[in-house]
UniProtKB/Swiss-Prot annotation:
SUPFAM superfamilies the UniProt entry points to: Nucleotidylyl transferase
Subcellular location: Cytoplasm
UniProt source species: Aliivibrio fischeri (strain ATCC 700601 / ES114) (Vibrio fischeri)
Name assigned to this protein: Phosphopantetheine adenylyltransferase
Keyword presence, Nucleotidyltransferase: yes
Family membership: Belongs to the bacterial CoaD family.
Matches recorded under CDD domains: PPAT
Stretch forming the signal peptide: none
Gene name per UniProt: coaD
Pfam families in alphabetical order: CTP_transf_like
This protein's UniProt keywords: ATP-binding, Coenzyme A biosynthesis, Cytoplasm, Magnesium, Nucleotide-binding, Nucleotidyltransferase, Transferase
GO molecular function, one term: ATP binding
Reaction equations catalysed: (R)-4'-phosphopantetheine + ATP + H(+) = 3'-dephospho-CoA + diphosphate
Residues the record lists as binding substrate: T10, K42, M74, R88
Subunit structure as annotated in this protein's UniProt entry: Homohexamer.
Amino acid sequence: MTKLTLYPGTFDPITNGHLDLIKRSASMFDHIIVAVAASPSKKTLFTLDERVQLVQAVTKDLPNVYVEGFSGLMVDFAKEKKANLLVRGLRTTMDFEYEFGLTSMYRKLMPELESVFLTPSEEYAFLSSTIVREVALHGGSVEAFVPSSVNQALKNKVASSL
């Protein structure tokens, strides 16, 4: 059975930690859709289209990875795509508690969707898009935390907001 795996997130912006999980997932599963969420309840720095383009740019060399934006419930997107696996990253016990609650809800809404949790590589365990955005918006360097094309996009976005 072919496994279609979703890796959902806001990716505002995509970080080296996200990319690490995508690459590791791509080596374990047949097909990965990086599902970039519209997340209207979050005030994002980048638009949905910009985030999709940034993720596409940094995953273009991964032949079994596809990138799509979506709005609405993740489980509805999973049903539409006929996904049967969901990959989520866990950095901390707080992430675990949050993800455990989400997974319980997903099971009620779509019992056939299994969740797989991956822990980050050690060098990315502290990393989050929120931290990257905050550092970038305050003029700090984030080049060690994001792919170079994302770093440039952040610089451009911050410069245009001044």
